[in-house]
């Protein structure tokens, strides 16, 4: 059927007119032939075409008015469906306009676009009828989301189909770029959380309220809603983030049109990237991709201005060239001046050039994540815009950024062949601390922790869980537990800061598991740095300045104490350090800061860490006839900064040696990698409490340190004052370690740590008594053997706090057994096999501790498992000795 809008057929008169017109248009010059007559060439073909055009259906007939005749049977309506009876007032033009404006506003808020009335009725089918002003206004409305920009961009449904192009090429094309922008804009406008709140519209509003220039978008949310964008983002991060930033800026300006006065750029930060890469695993595969990694900041530069949008002045004619947008990899320079056509020279126009903040930091692998026997790898990270100055040396950082390369001339000179230096251009930076670990705990984890704290023997369980592979040393394990939980730091009036961390020094004979305690602490502490005194220098422990080989700028690099900020610094072979190096940590151990004044850098770094050190005595063995300070090559200023001094002696004790040997053999058999179902060895000593799993213990420590703030309220101040005065008197009388005010602060810190173990907000009397007991144990162990027994009897009421009577009686019985065994072997020779202790000797010693009833001790597991038996008829305690060892 012919098109009804086609022109009517030609008539013979029209053909004549055309011939006359062609004749008039022919050249008057006689040398040229006239135009050919197409009617003569085509013959009757034109006639046939005209006849065919006349055929077809006639739409305009004589009876067309019959379509409008009345038909009464079709004019009947159901009265129930009519609302003619109701009286509705006529709506004015203004009311209708206001109602439609309100509907459009609600539709924009819900992410729905209606066809605008102006575009629906005011447009012509012919695009030429629309003027440039109307086109511009329609485009502006589409940009701010008032109308759907359907005519300008054709939607791409299968955006993931790259049609053979690489991802970077595909997202750089106009069509996919526009589709990505539309989808991301829809995602920001319409994404709701589980509560039904608009997540990212609220984030944008909060960002603008705080005059910030970036907001965070969760990669998980993007993958759930727009999985194609989430697929493209890691593959082509430069192009995708550029689109995201532009969409975010347009959205911000649609809500706050004048926000460009605050900032000219809006950045989208990507968080929660699923895969975390180690710094040492970056390869060619990761180049120009979005990556996520962890590390510790070891060095930072200052915040420098970087050229962002450059304008140049032509030196010859003064013409201003530009703007040129500076990229990260290449430097853009004009070729010639369009005004005077000269090729230079050109100078940067300082007034009209735009700058942005730039900072370079060095990220090093976290100490706990370095494989054994490897040196830590490091990588430079570039921070731009508002990411600058968000971290300092010593911070543990989680960086999401683009792993890319830049040409480094100095690196080529060093290597002798062309290589590229790789850097990470940061997109999102998170400083990791204990708060994040606590936030990662589930409700079930918190409920388990709260239930565990209600256990009346929680302290004993925590102590038993400290280094469970080491036999005995309950005093050291209790001190380690207190150090890991720590006290509460105070800073009254921002004038005088009092540390809350507990410092611990372990000194003793070789082979007494000192280093094992440190290694265990490194594994269980939330943040720990392990070093040795032999391989540590003053700057290695504190901080040092060095000149950057490329920029020739002095930068500050952090040492072990700074890297362990808000964690634990473990120093083995503490006595092997030089005196000068050891003196450098005085400030760090008490004021918990490190002051630097070198190479024009005057600053102070935070070193809020617990110091746990291990040292060997002078000459290799601890001499009980000398004081602690005489046994250790450490000065009194450094010793007074340790809250607890633990002495480990390798003494001859047949009973303990037998139990220790059994424990070690049992441990080796139990933990052998090829062990199958074997009958287990009998435990050397039955455990009185259950251990806490190590993962749960680590969570318990972090939760307690982050959420519990113990306060000193109803404590017996006179008790502490009396103990301090008595301790000072004994100190001067014996000439041992001087007792200072620091020891009072140590008691308070240990009281707070003991309360924190129970997850209590207030320090109770029992916490203070336990802290005093720990302080006295530390002080008495540091004395000469000649005055140690006298001091134990003097402070017996403090030392016996919360000690099980069975433990006290076992300690006394062991001393009596050793004395009796030595006497028998001197009299009868080394072949003695039986040791008999009179019960009255034990009763007399027990009365000094106010212990009267010994029957529970005779029935205890501690009594039986150590090979003792009680004869009630003869009233003696018997132990059998075999081959010089106790059975």
Curated annotation (Swiss-Prot):
It is an enzyme of class 3 (hydrolase). SMART domains: MCM (SM00350). ADP binds at residues 515-516. The keyword Isomerase does not apply. GO terms for cellular component: CMG complex; MCM complex; nucleus. Residues 458-665 form the MCM domain. Disulfide bonds: none annotated. Residues 33-42, 50-60 have a biased composition (Acidic residues). The modification Phosphothreonine is found at residue 26. Its EC number is 3.6.4.12. Residues 1-150 are annotated as: Disordered. Phosphorylated by the catalytic component of the Dbf4-dependent kinase (DDK) complex Cdc7. Early fractionation of eukaryotic MCM proteins yielded a variety of dimeric, trimeric and tetrameric complexes with unclear biological significance. Specifically a MCM467 subcomplex is shown to have in vitro helicase activity which is inhibited by the MCM2 subunit. The MCM2-7 hexamer is the proposed physiological active complex. This is DNA replication licensing factor Mcm2. It comes from Drosophila melanogaster (Fruit fly).
């Amino acid at each position: 059927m012919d098109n009804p809008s086609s022109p009517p057929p030609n008539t013979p008169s029209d053909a004549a007119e055309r011939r006359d017109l062609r004749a008039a248009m022919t050249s008057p010059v006689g040398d040229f032939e006239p135009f050919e007559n197409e009617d003569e060439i085509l013959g009757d073909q034109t006639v046939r075409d005209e006849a065919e055009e006349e055929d077809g259906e006639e739409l305009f007939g004589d009876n067309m008015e019959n379509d409008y005749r009345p038909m009464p049977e079709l004019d009947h309506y159901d009265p129930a469906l009519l609302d003619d009876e109701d009286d509705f007032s006529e709506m004015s033009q203004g009311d209708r306009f206001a109602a439609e404006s309100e509907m459009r506003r609600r539709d924009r808020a819900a992410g729905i676009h209606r066809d605008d009335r102006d575009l629906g009725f005011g447009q012509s089918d012919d695009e030429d009828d629309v003027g440039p002003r109307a086109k511009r206004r329609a485009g502006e409305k589409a940009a701010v989301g008032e109308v759907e920009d359907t005519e300008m961009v054709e939607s791409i449904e299968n955006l993931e189909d790259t049609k053979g192009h690489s991802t970077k090429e595909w997202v750089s094309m106009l069509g996919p770029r526009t589709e990505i922008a539309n989808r991301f804009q829809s995602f920001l406008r319409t994404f709701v959380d589980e509560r039904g709140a608009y997540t990212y519209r609220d984030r944008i509003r909060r960002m603008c309220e705080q005059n910030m220039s970036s907001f965070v978008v969760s990669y998980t949310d993007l993958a759930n809603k727009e999985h194609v964008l989430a697929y493209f983002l890691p593959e082509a991060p430069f192009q995708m983030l550029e689109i995201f930033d532009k969409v975010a800026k347009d959205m911000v300006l649609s809500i706050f049109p004048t926000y460009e006065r605050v900032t000219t750029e809006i950045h989208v930060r990507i968080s929660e990237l699923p895969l975390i890469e180690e710094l040492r695993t970056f390869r060619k595969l990761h180049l120009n991709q979005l990556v996520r990694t962890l590390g510790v900041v070891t060095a930072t530069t200052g915040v420098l201005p970087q050229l962002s949008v450059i304008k140049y002045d032509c030196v010859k004619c003064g013409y201003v060239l530009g703007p040129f947008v500076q990229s990260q990899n290449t430097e853009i320079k004009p070729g010639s001046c369009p005004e005077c056509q000269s090729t230079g020279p050109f100078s940067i126009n300082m007034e009209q050039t735009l700058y942005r903040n730039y900072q370079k930091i060095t990220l090093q692998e976290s100490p706990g994540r370095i494989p054994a026997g490897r040196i830590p790898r490091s990588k430079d990270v570039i921070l731009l815009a508002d990411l600058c100055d968000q971290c300092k040396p010593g911070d543990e950082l989680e960086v999401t950024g683009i792993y890319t390369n830049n040409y480094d001339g100095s690196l080529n000179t060093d290597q002798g062949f062309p290589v590229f230096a790789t850097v990470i251009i940061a997109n999102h930076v998170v400083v990791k601390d204990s708060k994040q670990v606590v936030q990662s705990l589930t409700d079930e984890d918190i409920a388990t922790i709260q239930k565990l704290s209600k256990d009346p023997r929680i302290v004993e369980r925590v102590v038993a869980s400290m280094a469970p592979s080491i036999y005995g040393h309950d005093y050291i394990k209790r001190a380690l537990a207190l150090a890991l939980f720590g006290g509460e730091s105070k800073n009254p009036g921002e004038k005088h800061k009092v540390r809350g961390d507990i410092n611990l020094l372990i000194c003793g004979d070789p082979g007494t598991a000192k280093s094992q305690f440190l290694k265990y602490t490194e594994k269980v502490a939330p943040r720990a740095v392990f070093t040795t005194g032999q391989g540590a220098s003053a700057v290695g422990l504190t901080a040092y300045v060095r000149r950057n080989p490329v920029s020739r700028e002095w930068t500050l690099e952090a040492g072990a104490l700074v890297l362990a900020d808000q964690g634990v610094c473990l120093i083995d072979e503490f006595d092997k350090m030089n005196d000068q190096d050891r003196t450098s940590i005085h400030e760090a151990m008490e004021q918990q800061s490190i002051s630097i004044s070198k190479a024009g850098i005057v600053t102070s770094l935070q070193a809020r860490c617990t110091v746990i050190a291990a040292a060997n005595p002078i000459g290799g063995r601890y001499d009980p006839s000398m004081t602690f300070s005489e046994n250790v090559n450490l000065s009194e200023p450094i010793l007074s900064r340790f809250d607890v001094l633990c002495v480990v002696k390798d003494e001859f004790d047949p009973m303990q040696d037998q139990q220790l040997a059994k424990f070690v053999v049992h441990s080796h058999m139990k933990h052998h990698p090829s062990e199958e179902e074997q009958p287990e060895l009998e435990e050397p000593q039955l455990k009185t409490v259950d251990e806490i799993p190590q993962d749960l213990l680590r969570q318990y420590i972090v939760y307690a340190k982050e959420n519990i703030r113990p306060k000193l309220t109803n404590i017996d101040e006179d008790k502490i004052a009396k103990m301090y005065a008595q301790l000072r008197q004994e100190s001067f009388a014996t000439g041992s370690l001087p007792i200072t005010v620091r020891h009072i602060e140590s008691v308070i810190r240990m009281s707070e740590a003991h309360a924190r173990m129970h997850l209590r907000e207030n320090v109770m009397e029992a916490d203070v008594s336990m802290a005093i007991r720990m302080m006295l144990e530390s002080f008495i162990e540091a004395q000469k053997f000649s005055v140690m027994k006298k001091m134990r009897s003097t402070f017996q009421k403090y030392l016996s706090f919360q000690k099980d009577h069975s433990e006290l009686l076992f300690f006394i019985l062991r001393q009596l057994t050793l004395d009796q065994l030595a006497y028998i072997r001197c009299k009868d020779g080394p072949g003695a096999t039986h040791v008999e202790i009179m019960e009255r000797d034990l009763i007399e010693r027990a009365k000094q501790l106010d212990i009267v009833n010994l029957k529970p001790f005779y029935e205890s597991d501690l009594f039986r498992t150590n090979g003792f038996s009680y004869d009630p008829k003869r009233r003696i305690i018997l132990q059998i000795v075999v081959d010089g060892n106790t059975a």
